[in-house]
Amino acid sequence: MKLTVKTLKGSHFEIRVLPTDTIMAVKKNIEDSQSKDNYPCGQQLLIHNGKVLKDETTLVENKVTEEGFLVVMLSKSKTASSAGPSSTQPTSTTTSTISSTTLAAPSTTQSIAVPASNSTPVQEQPTAQSDTYGQAASTLVSGSSIEQMVQQIMEMGGGSWDKETVTRALRAAYNNPERAVDYLYSGIPETVTIPATNLSGVGSGRELTAPPPSGGPNSSPLDLFPQEAVSDAAGGDLGTLEFLRGNDQFQQLRSMVNSNPQILQPMLQELGKQNPQLLRLIQENQAEFLQLLNEPYEGSDGDVDIFDQPDQEMPHSVNVTPEEQESIERLEAMGFDRAIVIEAFLSCDRNEELAANYLLEHSADFED
């Protein structure tokens, strides 16, 4: 029979199965038809009527029929079927620069976030750092797209979740649908702070937006601030960041940075891609920008000091060869967050095999 399989991105595809096929066999079927790179068997979660299906059960046992559908999503667990440092990635003939969002005008070279200090070993990095980075750099949806996503997740749950529950999970996941579904099944961790923001963006006039996703959950950059707001500021009192004080997205950024200062680097890096004019303005007014970040805000203790010494904590740049860039991409393809891959690669003296071994041995530490 033909079976429809839906994804969290709203797309769907069909596979041919037998009612007696096990869920593991269906996962293998999906891996074969959609490619191992996109849907590795070991990372798949198949959902039917709000229930995660067990590998050893069959379609008929789970009452899956041709008239129904399955939902497929990828878990963050690292398995042998989805990990391998020898996996190939498209090569690049251009020289790449790995940058940690320096407060300078962005260039056309590729840039990513690297923590400011290389003296800290990889194993000392807290798990919350990668979790917060994932929240900030993941695909975001907003406005009417959120309403559509809420409906899709409710449909996926087969009536198991109401709108309020789904909305709360999305807020906790910073509008990342895959993470939100994880929260719905496993519960929202106590360490996760649910931002008090209006998901629909109604009345704010300024929404978190992102271009259509082109890959994994970390493929779409953030658009923290609208271009027109920066243009208005530049056209008026050039050299001031006062307009950020009333910006909803900036307030959310302050809250996140207060919880974990490391998140500022990747968020500024993404900002440089989406809004280079604002990044240039921040570059010209670094002291004022840090002062705005350090100002007490509602919900804080009133004594926030994100950077004790701004000059000492500002990000830096690290150059890599095309071969090293390919190594980083292969490590990232194993399923690890890009920031963690960079940390491991540099700490292992740019040795891909050592970095891969470290990432696999400590994979449990990187999971949410």
Curated annotation (Swiss-Prot):
Reported tissue expression: Widely expressed in the whole plant.
Top-level lineage group: Eukaryota
CDD domains: UBA1_Rad23_plant, UBA2_RAD23_plant, Ubl_Rad23
Low complexity bias locations: 80-111
Chief location bin: nucleus
Keywords: Cytoplasm, DNA damage, DNA repair, Nucleus, Repeat
Subcellular location: Nucleus; Cytoplasm
Any one GO molecular-function label of the UniProt entry: damaged DNA binding
Function: May be involved in nucleotide excision repair. Binds and presumably selects ubiquitin-conjugates for destruction. Prefers multiubiquitin chains rather than single ubiquitins, with a binding affinity for 'Lys-48'-linked ubiquitin chains. Acts as a ubiquitin receptor that associates with the 26S proteasomal docking subunit RPN10 for the indirect recognition of ubiquitinated substrates of ubiquitin/26S proteasome-mediated proteolysis (UPP). Involved in UV tolerance in roots, specifically in dark conditions.
Record protein name field: Probable ubiquitin receptor RAD23a
Source organism of this protein record: Arabidopsis thaliana
